[in-house]
Amino acid sequence: MAKTGMYVGLDIGTTSVKVVVAEYIEGQMNIIGVGNAKSDGLNRGIVVDIDQTVQAIQRAVRQAEEKAGIQIKSVNVGLPANLLEVESCQGMIAVSSESKEITDEDVRNVASAALVRSTPPERQIVAILPQDFTVDGFEGIKDPRGMLGVRMEMFGVVYTGPKTIIHNIRKCVEKAGLGINELVITPLALTETILTDGEKDFGTIVIDMGGGQTTTSVIHDKQLKFTHVNQEGGEFITKDISIVLNTSFNNAEALKINYGDAYPERTSANEEFPVDVIGKSEPVRVDERYLSEIIEARVEQILRKSKEVLDEIDAFELPGGVVLTGGAASMPGIVDLAQEIFEANVKLYVPNHMGLRNPVFANVISIVEYSAQLNDIYHIAKYAIPGEKSKPAQSVAVQQEVRYDTYAEQPQEEYEEFNERESGEKVTGKIKDFFSNIFD
């Protein structure tokens, strides 16, 4: 059961920055504030302009503060999976106290012993997750505090990431005037919170299709075993539409949202709509099937890249199938196309919160839920990581009376609209055919 209190999640995405404020009362999560601001400071999930990213964070935070009636002081911020590495770790110590009763200090010491490793200078430890402990040969202990023992071992998982990415995210958040309670690995939070216990135990693939990149994750035995980032996302679909139809990026985005379908067999060549073409005085009629074929080409390329890396580790043998989420995954037809490509059971995850029933909010909600579920053992072990502070900051300061009902009053249309940014990546495969045929 989640702790009681207020939790704030921050998801810094390529196309938007999202903030969610949630109040937990007796384990019930109630979302009381949401912010969503266009992001101009990232490219393919990586911060490329700190000042613009800071401004987007501040806009999203202000929106959430106004709706929740609180002042946000610190956040739980998501960390992308770019160049993330996962390793097993093990540590062993002698219990230090004379009474041989295991204390918080012993747990921290055994976590420190597990972190004794040679970490390359360009990388740093992001998180350590204790799995279980062994006390004097007794295995499978989840919380050894208060037990008697002479020798204690800890088995867990350690995650490391590039210092540059981590530093830039921290810098943006701190420059926006916020503290950081938890730096949460986004695919870890996603797989932990959107899957059932059975899916996490027996093994499931999660594909998060964002605006600037697609993250493929595999969870098995309730552990995040594998992540892979493909630097293609929803904004690439928009870019393809813009180039092939010779229309502006904004028009292409509107076409994708209003008429887009990733599975041409579901569309009709008889259904047409007008497109404002650059260099022409009158709109050009384009049929629904042709637009769908443009979209299908890019989506198929993205999904096949995921399939390649998943085939290498035999991930499709896991019984949990594939779960799609993220803003780009909400397009009609993607589940059908994914089932055809993966030859596996595929489903779309949509958050079950009033006003936020859109996969685009899956990450930020997962960050909140994951942070709220972290236990004492995690926090004790976390302070064994070099540079971690001993106490988290207070998340919010209440400015006015807060309503703790579920977040249903704010219509989704109020969220700031945004257009996905342009990308210069060279398009391959079937997309090349569109670019050549358009001039025939």
Curated annotation (Swiss-Prot):
Cellular component, GO, one term = cell division site
- Topology relative to the membrane: Peripheral membrane protein
User: What Gene3D superfamilies is this protein classified in?
Assistant: 3.30.420.40
Q: Which UniProt keywords apply?
A: Cell cycle, Cell division, Cell membrane, Membrane
Please cite one Gene Ontology biological process associated with this protein: FtsZ-dependent cytokinesis
Repeat is among the record's keywords: no
Location in the cell reads:
Cell membrane
UniProt xrefs under SMART domains: FtsA
- What InterPro entries is this protein classified in? ATPase_NBD (IPR043129), Cell_div_FtsA (IPR020823), FtsA/MreB (IPR050696), FtsA_C (IPR021873), SHS2_FtsA (IPR003494)
UniProt keyword Nucleotide-binding, yes or no: no
> Which is an annotated Pfam family here?
SHS2_FTSA
- Briefly state the protein's biological role: Cell division protein that is involved in the assembly of the Z ring. May serve as a membrane anchor for the Z ring.
Family, according to the entry, reads as follows: Belongs to the FtsA/MreB family.
Subunit relationships? Self-interacts. Interacts with FtsZ.
Protein name in the entry: Cell division protein FtsA
Taxonomic lineage of this organism? Answer: Bacteria, Bacillati, Bacillota, Bacilli, Lactobacillales
